[in-house]
Amino acid sequence: MSDVVQKSAKAGGVLAATCISTLVVNANTSAVSILLPAISEDTGTSVGTLQWAVTGYSLVGAAVIVTSGSLGDVFGRKRVFQLGLLLFVVSCVLIALAQSGGLVIAGRMIQGAAGATILACGLSLLSVANDGDAQLRAVSLWGAAAAVGAAAGPLLGGVLVDVTGWQGLFWIDAGVALLCMVLTFVTVKESSDPDRPPTIDYAGTVLIALTLTPLILGVTKSADWGWFSVGTLGCFAVSIAAGYAFIAVEGRVAVPLLDLALLRNRVLVGSTIAILIGAGTINGLMYLLSLYFQDPAALDFSPLEAGLATLPATVGLVVIAPLVPKLAAKLGGRQTIGVGFALTTLGFVVVGLVDASWTYAAFLLPLVAIAVGMGMSNGPASSAATASVSENDVGGASGVSNMARYVGAAVATALAATVYGSVITNQTDDGASASDALASGLAAASWLMAVFSFLGVLMAFVIARHRAAKGTWNDAAAAAAAHTHTLPTSATAGRSGPEQG
């Protein structure tokens, strides 16, 4: 076999292993909210407690997403990628065998580390295995796999709950991850970055977790403890102290988790906040609707019906994704971001008007509006994050925005769950019917998401004009994947700062 054929076969193996594993990770992540009522029924753990299966995943992912990429650069990308796959298999088996909510949550937190490692190192492996146009095609396919996985997850989860029980998703994912491990072992060549200093910012990783964990704990327990209780304020104090310590550490380490100098870039800061808001609101929405649609006092959907109910939103994302780069190139990146968040805000405002008489048909248009708005804002925001910095800083900017996605998902889901549960409890205590209390909880949480989305509109004014992506197939894939990962676009290479356009 010639060297060219061997190289092509190896590159194909890398592409298959990384794309399949990414699709599985994202499908698993987006499916879990649909599974929560079934897990709650089997384990006897309240849905409110099980929200940690969602927020815990994102919390750990936020701490690990950048570090795992650094570990791959230093110790070998193939080695760390396979470690991520192994952890993913272990977490799936642990969750599938779990008899308690605590084990499910623990498994999901392990899965957060595994998923972040697979995403970070998988993209690095693709970049190393290909160059030029082949690299663009490979990254485009990876982005498409990420988007398809995230979109298909809720429907897949709903189907499997009805057919195999909620455990089926995790057994299937474990099997696919094992196959990816074998494929990686056979086809992927080890690589590392010999020019990178062999130091890892472990302190920064720990401090990110110490910043987020008490923050989310304080938010989720505030309804029981009180917002101004010693416990809640203590959690917030620990979070603030850890945040300050993180900033101090990042200013001193040789290779920081977060390059603080990047925070002087207005476009990067604005786009990162926009990315955080977008990821937070879409994850908060999926959590809320998964519970509301399946509650017997609300729409009483089966898991399959709840999964099918997300299809219009998925279709909205799929339809808008190829159009976003061209739209951004024509209107301008920040204008597209602003219009997208305005549409999302409008959708949440409509959902905020929900009452117990609503059928699914009443949710249809606002859900599509939210999804299309997300698709319009996330792609250009991701493009702006990397196009606003020099070529040498693209990796750092991408790391910042990807960390922001996990942070947004963790914090917004915790806030949405807290508001939803608190309002339901208060309404029930005041004598409201279960259906009215549920509708009031969803309305209150939706208004909160609307406020966050409106902040995204304001971020569009913070972001300076920048050169938008030109509308290549790679840009379309990047836009489609933007609610899960920041990918390079045609506006990224060789950038040195914001530009008119």
Report the location of each language-model feature.
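A residue-level signal for alpha-helical anchor/packing sites in multi-pass solute transporters
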Residues: 39, 124-125, 129, 159, ...
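Interfacial helix-cap and linker-helix signal at transmembrane-aqueous boundaries
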Residues: 39-40, 71-72, 156-164, 219, ...
